[in-house]
Amino acid sequence: MKQTVYTASPESQQIHVWSLEADGKLTLVQVVDAPGQVQPMVVSPNKEFLYVGVRPEFRVLAYRITPDNGALTFAGEAALPGSPTHISTDHHGRFVFSASYNQGCVSVTPLHDGLPGETITVVEGLEGCHSANISPDNRTLWVPALKQDRICLFTLSDDGFLSAQEPAEVTTVEGAGPRHMVFHPNQQYGYCVNELNSSIDVWELKDPKGNIECVQTLDMMPPDFSGVRWAADIHITPDGGHLYACDRTASIITVFSVSEDGSVLAVEGYQPTETQPRGFNLDHSGKYLIAAGQKSHHIAVYDIVGEQGLLQEKGRYAVGQGPMWVVVNAH
């Protein structure tokens, strides 16, 4: 398995393309000068395209991925209705979802042979809309509205339209600020990192009565932390055994173990990392974590070690200015 790491640096308007070697070392393959401030990125399900959200002209860019080394070639673009804070796709590669924090909306853009077309759906009124996360069954779009302490739930139709589910939302505690999400591989649980109180909510996707329930809320900060909480990103290992979340004020990555059924998290440790870690990701083998320091202008690679899933720094690399996003492709 070959793996490629992509990092987006909006201040220098660059995408760095790295080959992730089997021993965890990174080799620079390409630096792409992008037509704007590149921020959120996602790889298409078929591994053939990288989609990138850019500002200040709100667009989604499509880059074709070279199979042998992961290098990028520009392939197309489409306008977006709001400044892209987070982008994702459905599991079949038919649609791109874009969440806009500033414009408070989520949109659906169709993909034709991998290239983005004209937006077909926009849902507004989502204050602080921070991500769009398709459920494992490809039917429900979970959309955290950070400023409203709620996660809105939409049914995705076959033609890409969104309609409110029943229930239409789930709510967090006041002041939590739900931000980003991941789902357990067993498709039974979702995990949301809350930006404003740096906590993790564990959501049971459907209990026997068909309800969605928060079954655990866990603090992700060290007991002696007294600063302003400012959580950012969250990811889970491919086997579902460990979960990681980062806080930008403390510049740490918190390590969690996950119970076998996915319902319970336990803190295993806190890893100091690059200054102001806005984004990070895991490789597809579950062996390495790559974190980006928005204020250090570097990325760091960590070994994931032992049953606790603790992190050991393996290497550190300069990237562009203000790196904010990391994605990993396996091909």
From Swiss-Prot:
Single GO biological process annotation from the record: pentose-phosphate shunt, oxidative branch
Keywords: Carbohydrate metabolism, Glucose metabolism, Hydrolase
Pfam family name, one: Lactonase
Gene Ontology MF terms in the entry: 6-phosphogluconolactonase activity
Catalytic activity, reaction form: 6-phospho-D-glucono-1,5-lactone + H2O = 6-phospho-D-gluconate + H(+)
Involved pathway(s): Carbohydrate degradation; pentose phosphate pathway; D-ribulose 5-phosphate from D-glucose 6-phosphate (oxidative stage): step 2/3
EC number: 3.1.1.31
Gene Ontology, cellular component aspect: cytosol
Top EC class of this enzyme: hydrolase
UniProt similarity note: Belongs to the cycloisomerase 2 family.
Function comment: Catalyzes the hydrolysis of 6-phosphogluconolactone to 6-phosphogluconate.
UniProt name for this protein: 6-phosphogluconolactonase
Lineage: Bacteria, Pseudomonadati, Pseudomonadota, Gammaproteobacteria, Enterobacterales
